[in-house]
């Protein structure tokens, strides 16, 4: 099953939501802004994730770079305005 994730990035934590193609919530969790923790949280869904969207706030660089370095090639930025 294809899955899609949105990552709502804040200064201290990230809210991760994962949806199926019918917009049913498959997973939700708030985690600390720690790349290893975020990658560990996403790992069970990695093969099914067809898109990840990160809010392009002032601090998005480390997260997007980390996701891309971990072979999440489907990372997109969303304009929060």
List the model feature ranges, each with a label:
Residues 1-81:
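Phosphate- and other anionic-substrate recognition elements at nucleic-acid/protein interfaces
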């Amino acid at each position: 099953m294809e899955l899609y994730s949105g990552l709502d990035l804040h200064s201290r934590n990230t809210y991760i939501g994962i949806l199926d193609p019918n917009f049913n919530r498959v997973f939700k969790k708030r985690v600390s802004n720690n790349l290893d923790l975020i990658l560990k949280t996403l790992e069970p869904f990695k093969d099914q994730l067809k898109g990840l969207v990160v809010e392009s706030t002032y601090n998005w660089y480390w997260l997007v770079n980390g996701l891309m370095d971990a072979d999440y090639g489907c990372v997109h930025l969303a304009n929060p305005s």
